[in-house]
Amino acid sequence: AYEGSNKRFMAGWLNTVLHPMEKDGVDFWWIDWQQWINDKKLTNLNNTWWINYVMFSDMERNRDTRPMLYHRWGGLGNHRYQIGFSGDAIISWKSLDFQPYFNSTASNVLYCYWSHDIGGHMHADSIDPEMYVRWMQFGLFSPILRSHSTKNAGLNKEPWVFSYPVTRILRNIVKERYALNPYIYTMARKTYDNALPLCRPMYYDYADSPQAYEMKNEYMFGDDMIVRPVTAPRNGAKATADVWLPKGNDWYEVASGKLIKGGQTVNDGFQLDEIPVYVKAGSVIPMYADTLKNLRGNDNPVVVNVYPSDGDCMSKAEY
């Protein structure tokens, strides 16, 4: 039986079971553990928080690599343990519609890296291609992009199991995620330095604007982008989304390339391969070319995307 508060038990489990596999090449563990809430011997010891602490502390023994943990939320203070698994997501538009809000407002407890079951995990026997594309688009502009589902042949999510038009869209999403790595990494460094998350509610940057508190599915993706994922099925050829663009800046709509004046809410239509993403005028976005297939090493040429504004001097520190 599991005894998380028993030092001898935990040492034996780590030394006998996990450490040998780490020597064989395992980099980190997804501890998808559904144990009882509190330890059976120590009153009020939360098992999830405790296993996070034990596992992370154990990984710190190897100072040649950065410890990384992937487990469920253990309560306040769990931001110390980097990546959180948000649980088994139900496959539905309603579930997708909740995740952008859930993801960004985790900033309020300093939790910056949620990993969701992109596409949903359970309670369906087949995948709606449109819903999966929209979920992947949200994943593209999330801290972690991880497609996942329960074991069911009808829920396979490899890009090539869909029709060619959907396969092409999914492939481009993955390519764009790779391409965005310099920007994401730069913003991750800022998260490390000042605890400002990559994905955060609009009111973090525009606290004086009432609209910033009303747009629940709209969020900042780093310092320079607004993202409002499509979370409902399209009506005809396009899905519509209301997007609030803060005043004080103009904003480039990535899907169309048009420049829109800030200080208004726009309602645009987006085809299945389009995402409501807006880049602040005056921004410099470092990216890789969309031909990149491997993020190892730092020798990939960086493409600098400039979004000009009137009269501004633009700069960007890139890590």
Give the positions of each predicted feature:
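Catalytic-domain carbohydrate-binding cleft regions of carbohydrate-active enzymes
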Residues: 1-275, 279-281, 314-315
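Accessory, solvent-exposed terminal regions and/or long lumenal/extracellular loops of proteins
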Residues: 274-319
